[in-house]
Amino acid sequence: MQNTDTTKYIIHSKINADGVIERPDIVGAIFGQTEGLLGADLDLRDLQKTGRIGRIEVMVTAKGGKTKGNIFVPSSLDKVETSILAASLETIDRVGPCSAKIEVFQVEDVRAVKRKKIIERAKLIFTKMFDETVPESQELADEVRQSVRVDELTYYGKSRIPCGPNVLNSDAIIILEGRADILNLLRYGIKNTICVGGTNIPPEVAELTKKKTVTAFTDGDRGGELIIRELLQVADIDYVARAPDGKCVEDLVQKEVIRALRRKVPVEQIIEKYGIQEREGEESTRVERGSKRKIRAPEIAPRITEKKLHKRIKIHRVSSKPDLYEEELPEEETKGKASAKAFEKVSVKAAEKVSEMVPATAGKVKTRSIVAKPQISARKAPAAARVSREKPAEKVPSAVKVSRGEAVRVSPAPVKTVPVSPEATRFRPHVEALKGTLTARILDSQDKVIEEIAVRDLASRLKTYKENIQSVVFDGVITQRLVDIASSNAIKNLIGVKIGNIAKVPADMEVLTASML
């Protein structure tokens, strides 16, 4: 008997006989007509006894005096021997008294079929059985972290508001929207958090904000903005942090959480942004509570006082000395104290080295005391000069030396006329005409327009140009590609709106922009 486990190939053949025949007739014809045909090594009887050939299966049907069917011969021989055996079956031309014809149409590789079944089954096992029984290592880690976060989650007050374990002991707390936000921040080690559960702020949270430095950390959507508005009305918060637009705090990763908290802004900026009116007495309370917010309170009062008492007017001097400022005192203070106080002496360069140009619309200048600002000597001060516009004046003499409040004045230096470059005379009319049109003009040696084309077609057109081109003016960016094409055409002038990333320019080419003309 043939062991089906060792079968390598199955020979599929079909038989057509002119007459009625049965299975024993076909099997007998196969053994009888192939006996001694292939030699002793490939004799079917010997091969079947040794198990190299399996049981021959025959399936036939007789209809209308003719018989049709299929013959299956299992083989454990190699490919060559199996092919010889299959070819020998086609030599059978008679079965019993009837003429017959056998034709082999397939040799099936049993091992290939088994491999396909193995692959399909392996896919099923991998997708279903592993997911159901064996969790991933990341799932195990997430499960452990989740259990730890749930254990650390505590509750505050009679309403059992979810919060972090350090919300009572910490000097600063973070107000979040919901329980999921607290769990996400606990995951990254932030434990001084408490949630409000929506826009209805619990009274316990509002009372807690009066004792601590509070940061409101909300989602980057409309709901987060509404929570901030509610907190500004019923609670006392110091800073506001927002998640990125369209994201929730519970979905942020550690890097996004840290970045959002570092970018928190003082509550005063949020009040100005949303245009919210503070409750009566709340603004004074914010300044008086120095113990709660030690950073912001000292900065507010000096800034307001300085802004009200002094107006700074910068004096431009052609000198390497630090910038000087004129501090304009109020008129009432000037009248009462101008004669009593002596002004400090400030060393200034000689009058012949100092000149100042003042716009023609400058007005009267009030009594000033010129004071050097040593704290800003290492950097440039703002160049904004404030002058009253009561009466137009053509020029105001500049102060050059100060002694006890008196200034020595010199007339301003004359304005120098800058000569117009020849390129400006030649190409400026073309630049003005092409501004905003996205077109280009190709000029000859006499600066006459040879052709006017679109900027997008300029590079391809210059490649095919054979006429004598001297200059190209166009409303676009000068690129390295255009420079190379212009150089190959011996173009001397290339004028555009601005210069892009250019690594090299030929020595005989002039590259200009509209601002250079």
Swiss-Prot record:
One of its GO terms (biological process) is DNA replication, synthesis of primer. One of its GO terms (molecular function) is DNA-directed RNA polymerase activity. InterPro entries: DnaG_primase, Primase_DnaG_arc, TOPRIM_DnaG/twinkle, TOPRIM_dom. Residues 171-257 form the Toprim domain. GO terms for cellular component: cytoplasm; DNA-directed RNA polymerase complex; exosome (RNase complex); primosome complex. Disulfide bonds: none annotated. Binds two Mg(2+) per subunit. Its EC number is 2.7.7.101. Keywords: DNA replication, DNA-directed RNA polymerase, Exosome, Magnesium, Metal-binding, Nucleotidyltransferase, Primosome, Transcription, Transferase. It is an enzyme of class 2 (transferase). Its cofactor is Mg(2+). Coiled coil: none annotated. Mg(2+) 1 binds at E177, D219. Pfam families: Toprim_4. It catalyses: ssDNA + n NTP = ssDNA/pppN(pN)n-1 hybrid + (n-1) diphosphate. Mg(2+) 2 binds at D219, D221. Forms a ternary complex with MCM helicase and DNA. Component of the archaeal exosome complex. Belongs to the archaeal DnaG primase family. RNA polymerase that catalyzes the synthesis of short RNA molecules used as primers for DNA polymerase during DNA replication. Also part of the exosome, which is a complex involved in RNA degradation. Acts as a poly(A)-binding protein that enhances the interaction between heteromeric, adenine-rich transcripts and the exosome. This is DNA primase DnaG.
